[in-house]
Amino acid sequence: MKIIEAFAVKNKCYQAGAPLTPRGIMLHSVGCAQPSAAVFARSFNQYQPGGVSVCVHAFAQADGTVYQTLPWEMRGWHCGGSANSTHIGVEMTEPSAGMTYAEAAEQIAGTYHTAVELFAELCKQYELDPAQDGVIIGHAEGHRRGVASNHADPELLWRTYDMGYTMNGFRRDVAEAMAKEDREEVPDMPRYDSVAEMPQWARAGVQRLIDRGALQGNTDGKLDVSEDMIRTMIVCQRMVDEQKET
């Protein structure tokens, strides 16, 4: 995912500059046949786009690009209700009128996955739980909760193209994306097959374990131990030695 800062500095909302402490994120779809987020970023950079006081935080498109039009901690005007004071607003772009059904479905899937990735990043940044009630909501869900105006997005678009997407599924996908990112951030710990391969600090302690028969390795004669295993064994051996001394 690539986030391009394209702040709508001419927009009335941006110039108002009201602060926002994000407690959730609202998902929208733009409601018109335009797949380019850049087009929306440009059109929103005016005082009142289309004569309306409106501004969302970002637009997501199918290739993984996000155009950010407001700082995340600035109050947006994206839902016509009180959720403007609590939620970041993100719009997904929609297929162009000239696309085939298959092309449109591909575009929708692309924007969906871009949105999932963005929401996962924002949830991590602001320590939000995507599974918690009310944290991630669609515009239509916001209306049913009484915190947004009467819109049917984004699920109307998904149903129109029979995508099988739902907001419940979206929340699950965001949670999974966060979990996957956490797993990828944990580096693989190196393993050592012999004392000679180990860090200097570990060699004497491991050799004592081998001499005492506490560490023998596998059938190939390889120790195959990680650094955390080495530390644990050495600490345990020291505790045993201290008990013997007392």
Where are these regions (language model features)?
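N-terminal catalytic cores of peptidoglycan-degrading enzymes
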Residues: 1-84
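Basic/polar, cationic surfaces and motifs that engage anionic cell-wall
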Residues: 2-8, 15-19, 95-189
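Solvent-exposed, acidic/flexible segments
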Residues: 20, 83, 104-112, 116, ...
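Short connector loops/turns at beta-strand edges and beta->alpha or beta->beta junctions
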Residues: 32, 92-97
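Extracytoplasmic/secreted proteins, especially bacterial periplasmic and envelope-associated proteins
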Residues: 54-55, 110-121, 169, 200-204, ...
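Sec-exported extracytoplasmic/periplasmic mature domains
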Residues: 71, 120-127, 175, 179, ...
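Short coil-to-beta-strand
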Residues: 81-93
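Short, solvent-exposed alpha-helical surface patches in non-cytosolic proteins
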Residues: 185-246
